Amino acid sequence: MDLSVIKAASLDLESLPSQPTVSSFQQLRETFIQSKSEDWYLKNGLFFRYYSFLKSSLENATLDGPSQVACLDTISVWLRRIFNACKQDPEISKYVWDTMELKFWTNLFSLPANKISIPGLTGVQVAVKDVFSKSLQLYLLVCPSEDIKNDFLLDSLKHALHWDRHAKVVCTAIQLLVKVTGAEAVFAFQPDFFEQSLKLLKDYSYAQAISSTILTVLTLRFKSLSEETEDREEVETKWMNIWCPIILYEFYGNDRQVQAGMSSFLIPSLLGVSPGITVKFLSRLQNYPNVSKDARDAACLYALKIAKDSKIIKNLDLVKEHAFVKTLFKHPDIKIQLACFRLIALCPNVSSPLSFEDFDCLESNIEFSFNVLDPDSRQILLKSMQDFFIRLRASCHSIARTMRSRHSDKVALSGLLDRAMQFLTSFISVCKKHLYPTCNYQQVLVSLSFLDTLISFGLDDNVESSSIREAQHDFPFSMVIIDRDLSRLMIDRLKDPYDDIRNLCLKILLSYKSLPGFISDSDAYFLFNHGLELLNAVRSHECDGGAKTIYLCNHFMEKSVPGSVLANTKVILNRLKSNIEHAKTSLLEAAVNCPLQGYLIQLTYIFQSLSPTIVKNDNESWKNIVMELIKASETIWGLIKDVLCDDSPEGNLPDGEGEGGIVSNLEDTPAQLILSYSWRSLKETSSLLTVLLTKCLSLFDEEFTPFTLNYYGELMMTWLWEIRHRGAFTSVYPCFIEYCSFLFECNKHEISELPDPWLHKNLSVIQEKSSFITRRSGGIPLSITAILVAGKDKREQLIEQTVISLISIAKQPVEQKNIAGQFDLPQVHAMNTLKTIFTEHRLSSVSVEYLEPAIALSIEGFSHELWPIRNCSVMLFTALINRAFGSKKPKDAVNLGNNKGLSTKMFFSKFPTLHDYLLRELEVSVASLSSNDQPSTGLYPILNMFSRLQYAQPYGNENEWTGLSQFEPLIFKCTASRICKVREIASLSLTCLLDCSKMTTFIVSQLKGVAGLQQNEIHGKLLTIRAVLSCFFSKLTLQQVQEFYEVVPLAFINCFLEFTSSKTSFYAKKLFLEVLNSYFMSNTDSNAKRLQQLRRMTMDYCKRMLLDRKANVTNVFNTIGLPIHQQMAATIFLENLKEFSVYCDAHSIGFLVSKLLHYEFYEVQLTTLRSIVDSPRKKIIVNNPEILQALIKLTPRNQWSQVRALALSLLSDSLNSTSYRLLGISCSDMVSNILSNECLPIKESFIVLLGSCIKQLKTENFLEYKVTFAKWVEILLSYSNEYQPFSSRKAALDSIIHFDLFNAESTAEAFSFEFYILYLLLGDFLNDDDEEIRSLAANHAYQVLGTSAQCVTEIWNLWKLRTKATFGGQHDFQHCINKRLILEDGCELASVQLDNALSRNCSLFERERQNLYYSDNQKLEDLLFYASYPNEKLKDWATDGINAILSRFEDVSRDGPLGKTSDPNVWFTIYKIIRIAEHVHLPLDRVHSLMNRIDGHPSFCQ
């Protein structure tokens, strides 16, 4: 800025505008900065001259947001210059005090409360903090009287303590004030300051600021206590009594968010205040009463972590003092296990060495890390392991450096280094074990992630330097991480079904200088040939595995034999051409035997990584390959075009493809095979073509002329225009974006301009083509959007012309054509394209500028006469709303006091033209609604928009925004509409017009004058009250809640009779009861007399309506809505029955509940049943004789299935000898029902009930018990299968739990037959795929075992021991184990199982295991734990298996990586044969010799 301008402005106050702007404030701020010091010493200087202006500006509520921030920045500089002047001249200090009014000081000190945030601006709190701190400095300097100073600052502190501390500037203000006033003032003004502050830690984003505030107050209090007495022990005890009880209560509470805030920020600082605090805190933590040992240990674990992170505790004593930490590795909560690992493995001082006990503990418990199922916990684990390796490296380096010292204990230090190496070796072997085939996803992923992290630390000399992370020091030793066996396992995993596992394996292998264990050329060519075989696979993950294998081979082969990549590419190209020729003859045969996708994927990999150096060595050959591939892309398109462009591509079978012998041998339908072949081929073709066009322009520019590039761009657009299969054209979309981006960024003008005319061509296609009429316009919107996304530099220009053109097309009148009764609807395509543009997140910053005309277009489309346009208008409106409002969270989702929605003022300031448009449309719609009760369909989107807005809260001295004053009466009219849906959405819309603080007054006003209103008006008022309460009640302050319960209950009491009269509809009554139940019936405050009166009146009404038949009208017309009204009445009655039982006359609770179970409406019956199910006293309630009788009457077939299913499941909790006879259903009848064609919920309820009945039958009729038990076991086996749905498996588990293994275990006769099956089934449930089932099974298992709660893995280990000890010697048990071991898919012979595994399955999809938690090899090892020795059955089976292995692989010359023995099915079959053979002590020398000869899987070689 020109200095002369500044000086001129500083001399002329009149030059400042009456309504200052950002520029005027910036100019004035520069004036203050550039001014001389003497200008501030004069009484008529810069201070006095601008005081009035700045004072009025601070109070000006009409300033926009940027101007307010600029004003604060200017005042900050002004205050600093005044402060400096006052320090130099006391006279100026006195003058400032006399001039600045108390109101101005008050405004300055109130800024943190009034200017917490300004919508749309950042940095507001920083500016406010700066002004507040400078204001406090100046006030302390200029105030002449200590009394005045203390009174003002204490009053400021008192107000500040009531401000919203969800703002960091408020926390800072309190800290600054407390440092002046002292901590005693805080506790005087707010005795529960610490308790209130602790609750605010729930929001982690503010936890640090709030913790700093708490710490400031408590530290000052500690200093004041220290001044009172010199006894440090007494000071620490008194000080801890202030905060420790509340901290301990939260430590053992259930609020994880508060605990996280305390642990991260508050407690470490508190423990560091004085040396003795930590010991006292841990002592109080360990002696906290009324908590379990597990909870106490877990809390101590967190405390130890805090102390260790704070460097208060340096080393853990895992042998004595902290031995409990080792047991917590078996805790049920995975977060506790992770905390144990982090506590031992990590240390703030990374060079601190681990002890032998630390290594032993980690090594013995490291298995826990491979069973982490939760993705978030897994990320924490991986980061923790990385930090652990950093510490291990630093500590080993430190040890090695110390060993060079002359006085060091070299023997002890050398032992620590050796132990570190032993740990790493053991760790790698554990990772290796979890890479074997059939290991579950999380085990493989964690293992690979660990290894990927470990190799980046430079331990292995064979790792490329580019793959090693930079560090100041290295490990003092080296070791081989990936050996031949691990390398083989990773290569095998290249065809894993999961993308992330395949990619991670390839990344690890490529990080090595040479492929570990495969260094010869023959190894590379062998791998290459295996990769070629996989390229011809049907399944996509196998194709990709083959492509990755060849990519891996190319990477290493090119290093040793230059030109290998070219030679390999030619081989792949020839195979691709051969398969294309097969497709010309028969698409079906090509889909089965000669797919294209694998070769296309591989070629894409080759050209993505192709370096110019390789091309230069044989330029002409590479050019020929590129041109052949580009032509091949057109050939492929010609082959698959008819399939993908068919009106019904999913069921299209080209002529002649359904004939021939190949069809009879297919496992998939021909149409499915051809379609999959076609769209996958196109997907990979588009990807390859894009890579070729973008990569090779710089290599062969003479071949890729603008004409050629334009031709293939139009070809891609043709794919998007004509293809009907959504999977196909959506796969082209990202490729077309990449291609257009490349063209736009090209430095050649004639190429960079190519996409522009494509955009116009797309717009022409919308109007010209009528063959694309689909509900979402196929790929046309993607074709246009791709160009807009790609044109980064031209994006604003392109979007402007595109959106304007599309809106113009969408507004064109529809012309009907009588050709085959179809419509040519470019309007539909235009609106669908707009929807795609506004949905695309990469265009959000630009597209939002055109939201206003698009919203208007979509609203008008709601009223269109044609359904296709109305339909796409709805979809467009949804996309626009999501773009305007961002998050899809419900409106009432509040984040701890932060209003993060879009206010009405902000919305209409962003989209100003919508104000008049929406008002005009709303007036028309309401007028139509009033005249003929037929709303314009545009009314719904308008009200929907308002329902998503929030009230425009004024900031500071701003006046309330009145921009919606014209909308308010219109929306209120809608709440009284005769159309229910209009009333509902209008009531939600009203919430944006109401200030939360005025909610109580508003509700009272709504409840006045209810008498005489029509039913629709009453219903509308109740809907409005419900919407307002739902939106605002959770945001009320404690004082506002108290006011609410003092005022509103009386208003409800006054109109209670009107709402519940016979004239009021049951819909309105139900809504009335719903409001009472949600906001009044749960409040049991006995001091609120009016509230309790309202609750009693509600309870009496519900009882009268439910139990007094005369209270219900008999006129059929007046009973509309009665069932749902009675359902809500039943909900209230049942939830409060125990509390109000004194008002239930002489009737018992059992009688009242049984009456509801017999009610005429099934809604009431369902509500009653669900209330019993959810009750913690369920068993007591069900065993009430009257309730039991009622439940039994709900079990016959003529009852509604949902009612019947719930009743049956409840009866399982009630059975005793009396109730069993009353039930009237025998166990055989239950079995018949389960085996019948009853609906699944009924069957599952009978299964649960059957477990209880058999338990009772055991004591009454043992013969029948034995027969029924066997049938029950068969049912459990069929319903516990992993392929059964969750509800069926849970029903089977519940049946076992109701049978009660704990009590049944003591019955001797139970062990005389198949009782062991229940133990085996419970073991299966302990390893179920669903965590809820595992937890339920673990709860029952540790009750039977008599142990404390532990992790499921540990419970399972104990359960295995108990099962074997109890049943291991029984013949039937061993027979069952043998059957489980050797039976596979109904086949018993090992040789047949091996043949089945070896046979190639050409189906598109394999049958996937549903249990991804419990792997096959884990299950095998557990079954072998039970199996006896000697065991002739297993011996015969294993012998057959060994002979099968020897014969099937006798002629194999080499199996190797990706070979047959690496196939998961083949591997597991062979592994099972070998493990069972080892169990029965059969010799395996021939098998091991064979596997060594053919290079079989490492687990089979010795």
Swiss-Prot record:
GO molecular function (one): enzyme regulator activity
tRNA processing found in the keyword field: yes
Protein's organism: Schizosaccharomyces pombe (strain 972 / ATCC 24843) (Fission yeast)
Loss of function: phenotype: Loss of methylation of the 2'-O-ribose of cytidine at position 32 of tRNA(Phe). Increases occurrence of 1-methylguanosine residue at position 37 in the tRNA anticodon loop of tRNA(Phe) and decreases occurrence of wybutosine at this position.
Compartment list: Cytoplasm; Nucleus
GO cellular component entries: cytosol; nucleus
Record key words, sorted: Cytoplasm, Nucleus, tRNA processing
InterPro entries: ARM-type_fold, THADA-like_TPR, THADA-like_TPR_C, THADA/TRM732_DUF2428, tRNA_methyltransferase_THADA
One GO biological process term: tRNA nucleoside ribose methylation
Annotated function: Together with methyltransferase trm7, methylates the 2'-O-ribose of nucleotides at position 32 of the anticodon loop of substrate tRNAs.
Presence of the UniProt keyword Cytoplasm in the record: yes
Family, per entry: Belongs to the THADA family.
Protein name per its UniProtKB record: tRNA (32-2'-O)-methyltransferase regulator trm732
Lineage: Eukaryota, Fungi, Dikarya, Ascomycota, Taphrinomycotina
